[in-house]
Amino acid sequence: LVRRGDHALIQGEIPLSFLNKIQQVKYRLNPFIVNTAMLLEERGVSVGKFLPIVHYDLPPKPVDIAENKESRKKYRREAAEVMNKRAAEFKRSCRTRMTMEAVARFKDREFYIPWSFDYRGRAYPIPAFLTPQDTDFGKSLLNFADAAVMTEDAEEWLAFQVATTYGLDKATMQERLDWTRTHVSLIARVARNPIDHIGDWEGADEPWLFLAACEEYDACCLRQTRNLTSLPVATDATCSGLQILAGLARDKSTARLVN
């Protein structure tokens, strides 16, 4: 394994090769998600893990604040309430603000993500933002810089991503494909006007990833205005601990009990 910050490295060819391989993946930001986020940020609208700061104005000072003690006390109390709201809002919106700062920096650039192993040998991205292990909003900002040609398999995987991010992550592959194909009007609505139809996607399990998937599916499969796709499609294991143990032990009976 390769442990960042540890000079007593135990190096293995396979872990090093794996780490270098995933660090060679080139990314760019998804312009559709960036533009949607910027519009919602301007309006102070929150969706899922996207929490832009909401501005609170101080109350106007009363004209008699200098000579009226009660008026002065009332103003100070109201102003203190606003200042407390501002402080809470600043704290609540911290991650979103930092993510949007990273977006401004990388908006028109291609970039790579450095990774490292932890003490267990699990790979984690070193940056805190704009990574495949970010929040729902952070992950939705990522596209592969090198797009792939659309195929029938690619169409199925995009349909899979739409349904999975909406909330069908426990459904079978066929159930997910069927759900997407029976909800094309919803997908088109969300993809073509996400601001006016925010109610159609903000309730998804992973709303921002769902929004990104809808836009890609609409452009590549419904309208067919793009013949290249660059959307990352995520798959995740359940019972992963038992899967690993079954694999290490080559235990067929345990392996059959996990997916």
Give names to the regions the model predicted.
Residues 1-259:
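Non-catalytic nucleic-acid-binding interfaces of large nucleic-acid enzymes and RNP effectors
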